[in-house]
Amino acid sequence: MRDPYDACSNGDSSWVTIGDSYAGTLDFYLSKVLLEKGHGLMSLTYEQCPFVNDFWFGNVPECVEVNKRRWNIIKSFKERKNIIISANYYFFREGKLATNNPLEDGRNNLSYGIRANEDEVWHSFSKNIETLQALGHNVIVIYPIPSVTEDAKKMYLSLITDLKPQFDGII
């Protein structure tokens, strides 16, 4: 897994991806298309590490430190970026509170921890998006990305069907 301070980037890095490996699945294609259009991509993705402060997931307690480093990088940007955020949002219900030593616990592959309130995880995610916008960045949230075990067509169709009452019509 790549430390955010060693983030992969190319071109003008006017676009940034942030999130866990779900967001990372977008990097190859985005990078290719952006370079063809004279732009570039910086990837701040990290396995099992969505863009939320003070929480961690799976066996990645260092996620707390990863997000601090992401913020340090973001605060160093000299110009507005197009920031794409995505994650396996299912894991928000399995967030854990920060440990006392996230980097050491990460090296030890710690997987147990004190369960966080899912609403607090979502609040942190929302607050991060609001902060990015307040800094002047263009934020694009991609939700949801189907897992490899899901039928994407059925999943998206069910989402549209569930939203139908909120619209005058569906195209």
Locate predicted features:
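Extracellular/periplasmic envelope-modification machinery, especially enzymes
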Residues: 1-171
